[in-house]
From Swiss-Prot:
Fe cation binds at residues 174, 176, 310. It is an enzyme of class 1 (oxidoreductase). It comes from Niastella koreensis (strain DSM 17620 / KACC 11465 / NBRC 106392 / GR20-10). Binds 1 Fe(2+) ion per subunit. Alpha-ketoglutarate-dependent dioxygenase that in vitro catalyzes the regio- and stereoselective hydroxylation of L-lysine, leading to (4R)-4-hydroxy-L-lysine. Its EC number is 1.14.11.-. The lineage of its organism: Bacteria, Pseudomonadati, Bacteroidota, Chitinophagia, Chitinophagales. Its cofactor is Fe(2+). It catalyses: L-lysine + 2-oxoglutarate + O2 = (4R)-4-hydroxy-L-lysine + succinate + CO2. This is L-lysine 4-hydroxylase. Keywords: Dioxygenase, Iron, Metal-binding, Oxidoreductase.
Length: 371
């Protein structure tokens, strides 16, 4: 008779299950959705803002006590699962209702965002991170901080850039802030609007299966990554630090990767060996990109930033396709939150009096003048 241990070994043995090629999609029930909305309203009355110190300090307790049990359980397991079968992303379909009238028109860019209209959504996103458990943080490298919640809006002035404000070119898959050693551990993307019906793209290092010869070359610390298009060219100059693309366990690696900046940016300055390895890897990775999910209003994508890269297809902001005709609509609006599982490990790169504010500029270098 087969023992439990033998059964588990058989199930987990190589070749039994194929590598994951898509995220787990969780359909949130009407009861769960109503519960989450009610909880957010209660927290809004109690604390006023999702950045209130008393709320943030008790975030994990609030998350496990207040979120629907199924949702909290899914996130808690997700936070500790780095296995061969873990894709590294979750989709919560229909997480929350969005009052489009109360939201008002989408502003021209993130700079004009009225965050007073988004406080409830900030509570919802932070609770999800709290259930990992992980702590929302902000980065000086991203909008000089800008708070724990960022509105991501297509900006016509940046439409051709490889940033969240772009639209007219595909945003290549990337792990968030691949030019930092202390990049976010987890990301959430809450879609308030996506009337243009833009697919979100995801790519998981787990989709390759076991580490192959091409991937093994990416453990070498020979790769450069400039800061992204949010920075001027002179701010990107002279970045000579090199690091690996893959790190951690060699059989179940993590990834730090930005195709746009490390491969397509001519100023990256990769060595011939590094570029050769990157191009070979990218040829494989491109075949594994998932872009079958088109977010609707109220959907949320939750990502392990060490396992899964994200991006989006190109689109014409403010227009949707109806029977082959472009029809004007409200421009897309998404909310991003980032978090770290430990504040202890990042204290050397945070503001002295704010352990949630990360001051890393590029691979360990700090924005010293802003401390």
């Amino acid at each position: 008779m087969e023992t439990i241990i033998e059964s588990r070994q058989r199930i987990n043995s190589p070749g039994v299950l194929p590598p994951p090629l898509s995220p787990l999609i969780v359909d949130v029930t009407p009861k769960e959705r109503a519960s989450i909305s009610n909880v957010a309203n209660i927290l809004l009355k109690a604390f006023g803002h999702y950045e209130h110190p008393d709320f943030i300090s008790a975030l994990h307790l609030n998350a496990f006590q207040l979120l629907p049990e199924r949702i909290a359980g899914i996130l808690s397991r997700f936070g500790t699962d780095f296995s061969r079968h873990q894709y590294g992303a979750l989709v919560f379909r229909g997480l929350t209702e969005v009052d489009q009238e109360a939201l008002g028109p989408t502003p021209p860019s993130w700079k004009e965002t009225d965050y007073s209209k988004l406080v409830k959504y900030g509570f919802i996103c932070s609770l999800l991170h709290g259930a990992i458990p992980s702590k929302p943080v902000q980065y000086y490298a991203q909008r000089k901080g800008g708070g724990l919640l960022h509105a991501v809006i297509p900006d016509e002035k940046m439409s051709h850039t490889q940033t969240g404000s772009g639209s007219r070119t595909d945003l290549f898959v990337h792990t968030e802030d691949a030019f930092l050693f202390n990049q976010a551990d987890f990301l959430s993307f809450l879609f308030l609007r996506n009337e243009e019906q833009v697919p979100s793209t995801l790519y998981s290092i787990r989709s390759h299966g076991d580490t192959n010869a091409i991937m093994a070359e990416l453990f070498k610390p020979i790769y450069k990554c400039p800061k992204d298009a949010n920075y001027a060219d002179d701010e990107n100059a002279g970045e000579e630090v090199t690091t690996s693309i893959l790190y951690g366990n060699r059989e179940r690696p993590f990834i730090r990767f930005d195709a746009a900046e490390q491969i397509y940016n001519e100023k990256a300055g990769q060595t011939p060996e590094a570029m050769h390895n990157l191009v070979r890897f990218w040829d494989e990775a491109k075949q594994l990109i998932y872009n079958d999910f088109v977010p609707d209003s109220g959907d949320l994508i939750f990502v392990n930033n060490h396992l899964c890269a994200h991006g989006r297809n190109s689109f014409v902001a403010g227009y949707r396709n109806e029977n082959g005709q472009l029809v004007k609509c409200e421009r897309r609006l998404m909310l991003r939150m980032m978090s770290k599982t430990s504040l202890i490990n990042i204290q050397s790169v945070t503001q002295l009096n704010d352990p949630y504010f990360i001051m890393e500029e590029h691979y360990g270098k700090l924005f010293h003048s802003q401390q």
